[in-house]
């Protein structure tokens, strides 16, 4: 919505040409192309630029638009330089839950008044330019507030002061709402300005749902804007087309009043017939308009795709009819934020919406519905059907495994019965001690017999051992005799002839010596 306001406020043919090009791009891309693009799975860069270029205009403005805004801001600063520096800067409102309280605080407390006056808005720190300050009571086609008679918070009129371009950028960024150094720019603390009106947004939301007061006319009650939860930070500029603007008949400086196109769009959606989809309940609409997606199991994939296609087509037609019915509310005020308040021009009807913006929203909503439908069909085809096939395969595998388990169980039971009835009975009979024919009895008899034989054998072995010992002693003696005989035989073989008769020779010699000694001794004795 903020991007649409910037588009309407741009001058020249730059953004208008972009609007016409994007319009032609949307008209040249029917539903079949979008479906083919999503089914093919390839990103379409051109189509993406057609859909997403305009929503991003507010944050990615072109160089030409920024240059034009900067030139106009410099021109305005040169004209109102001295007057602007004498005034305080505008208070940055704080819309956090700490300042605006909760919905539950307002549900159990009575609201002060159904219609909040402009003085209450001044005490809360709101500017008449803010979309929430559009008073619910209209006098005529559109309220004409005197800006000079009702000064703002700082005690100055909107005619003598307009925030600079840098100040607008600071207000647009959400991070600047809670800075503690706002006082150095001459700004009031948001917590101080919202002390007396903490539940302002809650009352504003509840008042948008209540019927209008008796003093309001039918036209003015129909023109009351609904609660806008999204704050449009970009102020719309007047289009340069001569068909949408004309000077006021009285010629005096009219009040600078800004109605956001987003609030008007919400009002058109609320004032649409009951059969159309309400914008305040998107979850229920999604749940009612896509039964095939909510319950994909009850329908076949083809039926689910057809059902989602029919439901999204009906929702697209209803949104188109609601946006086309909004052309009856063809009155809007376009305000140039960089021009003095005295130079503001209004249309003859004072409330005429830009037809290009309405066409853009109609095409954008329809195209988004088509893309959502194609995305749902793509999800059904690529994810749900794939999951369904996997589920069928898993069920088949599960049945197969269950069958195998049953067969294995039956075989196990058969083995158990066979072991218990046949094998165990045979084992019990074989190991029965009382039965002489059993395996255990026969084995015991055999073992006892063999033990007796082994004992007899041991006795025989003992007697044999004794006899063997005696034989060993005899053999030892015989061996000693044999060894002596062998030594004698060896010595006989080793004796020579000299050694053999040496002893006899010695005996003879000794005998001769003895005889000689005896003869000598006898001779000596005989001679005496």
Swiss-Prot record:
Where would you say this protein principally sits, based on its record? endoplasmic reticulum
Q: Which modifications occur after translation, per UniProt?
A: Phosphorylated by CDC28.
> This protein's superkingdom?
Eukaryota
Species whose genome carries this gene: Saccharomyces cerevisiae (strain ATCC 204508 / S288c) (Baker's yeast)
Function description:
Required for growth under high NaCl, alkaline pH and cell wall stress.
Q: Report what the protein is called.
A: Protein HPH2
Q: Where are the transmembrane segments?
A: 505-521
Bias kind Low complexity: ranges: 1-13, 283-296, 308-332
**Compositional bias (Basic and acidic residues) at which positions?**
17-36
Q: What keywords were assigned to this record? A: Endoplasmic reticulum, Membrane, Phosphoprotein, Transmembrane, Transmembrane helix
Q: How is this protein organized at the quaternary level?
A: Interacts with HPH1/FRT1.
Q: What is the gene called? A: FRT2
Instruction: Tell me which InterPro entries the record gives.
Output: HPH_family (IPR025752)
Q: Where is this region: Disordered?
A: 1-52, 170-193, 230-257, 270-334
Annotated GO biological process: cellular response to alkaline pH; cellular response to salt stress; post-translational protein targeting to membrane, translocation
Membrane topology, from the record: Single-pass membrane protein
Subcellular locations according to the entry? Endoplasmic reticulum membrane
Coiled-coil residues: none
Tell me a GO cellular component.
Answer: endoplasmic reticulum membrane
């Amino acid at each position: 919505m903020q991007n649409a306001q910037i588009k309407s406020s741009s001058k020249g043919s730059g953004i208008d040409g972009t609007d016409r090009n994007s319009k032609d791009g949307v008209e040249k891309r029917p539903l079949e192309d979008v479906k083919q693009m999503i089914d093919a799975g390839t990103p379409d860069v051109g189509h993406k630029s057609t859909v997403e270029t305009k929503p991003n205009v507010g944050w990615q403005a072109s160089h030409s638009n920024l240059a034009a805004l900067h030139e106009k801001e410099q021109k305005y600063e040169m004209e109102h330089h001295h007057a602007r520096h004498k005034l305080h800067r505008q208070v940055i409102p704080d819309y956090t839950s700490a300042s605006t309280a909760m919905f539950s605080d307002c549900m159990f407390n009575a609201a002060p008044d159904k219609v909040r006056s402009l003085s209450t808005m001044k005490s809360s720190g709101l500017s008449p330019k803010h979309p929430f300050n559009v008073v619910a009571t209209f006098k005529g086609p559109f309220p004409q507030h005197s800006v000079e008679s009702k000064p703002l918070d700082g005690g100055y009129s909107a005619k003598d002061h307009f925030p600079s371009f840098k100040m607008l950028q600071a207000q647009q960024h959400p991070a600047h709402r809670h800075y503690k150094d706002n006082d150095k720019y001459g700004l009031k603390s948001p917590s101080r300005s919202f002390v007396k009106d903490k539940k302002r947004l809650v009352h504003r939301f509840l008042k948008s749902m209540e019927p209008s007061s008796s003093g309001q006319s039918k036209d003015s009650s129909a023109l009351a804007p609904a609660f806008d939860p999204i704050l449009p930070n970009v102020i719309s500029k007047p289009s340069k087309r001569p068909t949408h603007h004309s000077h006021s008949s009285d010629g005096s400086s009219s009040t600078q009043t800004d109605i956001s196109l987003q609030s008007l769009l919400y009002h058109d959606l609320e004032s649409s017939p009951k059969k159309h989809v309400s914008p305040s309940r998107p979850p229920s609409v999604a749940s009612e308009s896509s039964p095939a997606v909510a319950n994909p199991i009850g329908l076949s994939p083809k039926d689910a795709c057809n059902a989602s296609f029919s439901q999204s087509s009906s929702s697209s037609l209803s949104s188109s009819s609601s946006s086309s019915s909004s052309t009856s509310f063809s009155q809007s005020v376009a305000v140039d934020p960089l021009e003095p308040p005295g130079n503001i021009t209004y249309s003859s009807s004072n409330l005429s919406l830009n037809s290009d913006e309405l066409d853009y929203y109609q095409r954008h909503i329809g195209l988004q519905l088509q893309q959502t439908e194609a995305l749902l069909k793509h999800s059904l085809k690529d994810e749900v059907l794939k999951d369904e096939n996997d589920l069928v395969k898993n069920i088949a595998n599960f049945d197969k495994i269950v069958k195998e388990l049953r067969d294995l169980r039956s075989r196990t039971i058969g083995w158990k019965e066979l072991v218990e009835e046949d094998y165990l009975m045979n084992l019990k009979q074989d190991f029965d001690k009382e039965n002489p024919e059993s395996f255990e009895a026969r084995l015991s008899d055999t073992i006892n017999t063999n033990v007796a034989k082994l004992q007899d054998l041991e006795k025989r072995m003992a007697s044999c051992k004794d006899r063997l010992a005696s034989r060993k002693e005899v053999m030892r003696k015989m061996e000693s005799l044999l060894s002596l005989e062998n030594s004698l035989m060896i010595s006989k073989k080793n004796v020579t002839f000299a050694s053999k008769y040496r002893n006899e020779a010695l005996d003879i010699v000794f005998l001769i010596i003895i005889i000689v000694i005896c003869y000598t001794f006898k001779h000596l004795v005989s001679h005496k």
